[in-house]
């Protein structure tokens, strides 16, 4: 099993494209097996597997800092940062929490559990980095409806004029727990429909650079996009379109019902 050999992000950097595909399959199988016994968030994590592999392939955590909004979609991140046994061995299913936790790993920046906090937290990390004269990448990962929260908009407003390295990965699956509504999400749908070319672009309007990845479940496309923005000297949004629940038929068909689950029969 390839996942058994991944003890930290450095092990990802030597994988081939085919091995990354296989690793994603193994990670989803581990997520599925654990959720069937333990319960927990489901759809968000299944949609983020390839993006998490790509992030840890390109960036250099924990030097580069990841801030996961809510952090309910960080199970894959935990698997790849030395905590895989908590997803492979039933005896260790309770060894990790359902959210990021600095007491578990140096790869986790904050104890998070509430929505829309990542952009403000990440902007603070970027400001502190600059005051210290350091140069690591600061990466905020936000999705599942969090972008329309008030604190996220405050963070976006601040980041838009920071004029320093700040990378926002917008995980767009057109969902919160349930279907999203409102003018902001209408604009995001226009961006998806035009491969990121719509002039109705909130991020550009607020002063941020912008990249669009049509298939956010394609590790190679994601790696190319993340390499393009690594060490960038200004704020940028990488807008990735993912499928919530990807890889498990029932979760793909009922994205709201499979946002979170109690233990269940896999078949």
Q: For each of these PLM feature ranges, what is it?
A:
Residues 41-162:
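Cofactor-binding active-site loop characterized by glycine-rich and histidine/acidic residues
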Residues 1-81, 204, 210-222, 236-239:
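N-terminal amphipathic, basic-rich helices that act as targeting or association modules
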Residues 7, 25-31, 97-102, 132-133, ...:
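Short amphipathic alpha-helical segments, especially helix-boundary/capping motifs
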Residues 37, 45-56, 60, 76, ...:
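Short alpha-helical interface elements
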Residues 1, 7-10, 37, 82-85, ...:
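Residue-level signal for pocket-adjacent positions within structured domains
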Residues 108-267:
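Glycine-rich ThDP/TPP pyrophosphate-binding loop and its adjacent helix/strand module
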Residues 15-23, 87-94, 250-252:
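Short, functional N-terminal and low-complexity linear motifs
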